[in-house]
């Protein structure tokens, strides 16, 4: 669990799709003292108290920031995703994902020419890597042909990749629904891709 009070943050947000929920919706928590001073960024129905020709009076928070029709189905789906994850248990999910992460790192380290990016400390089950001599997009395309989904590119972090001296990376995101067999298939495919492109 996260305590925004313990963190001392002004805002805290996350995307639903990071929790197996739908795209296009997320959660934003904001400190009341800050939200109260903010004007609405968008206008529409249900967020105003009254509208006149030259000015408007807005609802109090949070309604002030809820213009128009909300993404009702997506919000319900996010709730279902959270219920699903809580039903399994977040500690159990974290345990499974950490075991998969360690297995994946061990397997990937054996792939010739593959370099893991990032630190060796505790981390979420996301791994970025480069395969020497093979552009990340080529790796992703070849893996996709094998039915393996990854992301490739700069991952909204171009300054980081410039500092690392690489032109992007391949990123895998593991989840408790993945298997050891899938990790082994990924590593086998990467060995074959390395041979094919060199």
Located regions from the model:
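Pyridoxal 5′-phosphate
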Residues: 1-198
């Amino acid at each position: 669990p996260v305590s925004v009070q313990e963190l001392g943050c002004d805002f805290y947000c996350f995307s639903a799709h990071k929790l197996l929920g739908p795209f296009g919706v997320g959660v934003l928590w904001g400190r009341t003292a800050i939200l109260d001073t903010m004007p609405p960024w968008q206008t529409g129905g249900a967020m105003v108290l009254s509208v006149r020709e030259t000015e408007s009076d807005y609802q109090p928070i949070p309604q002030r920031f809820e213009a128009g029709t909300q993404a009702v189905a997506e919000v319900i789906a996010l709730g279902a995703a959270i219920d699903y994850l809580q039903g399994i248990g977040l500690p159990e999910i974290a345990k499974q994902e950490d075991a998969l992460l360690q297995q994946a790192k061990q397997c990937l380290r054996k792939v010739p020419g593959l370099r893991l990016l990032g630190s060796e400390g505790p981390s979420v089950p996301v791994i970025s890597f480069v395969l020497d001599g093979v552009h990340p997009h080529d790796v992703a395309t070849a893996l996709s042909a094998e039915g393996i989904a990854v992301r490739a590119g700069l991952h909204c972090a171009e300054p980081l990749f410039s500092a690392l001296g690489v032109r992007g990376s391949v990123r895998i995101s593991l989840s408790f629904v993945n298997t050891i067999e899938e990790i082994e298939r990924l590593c086998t495919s990467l060995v074959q891709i390395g041979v094919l492109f060199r």
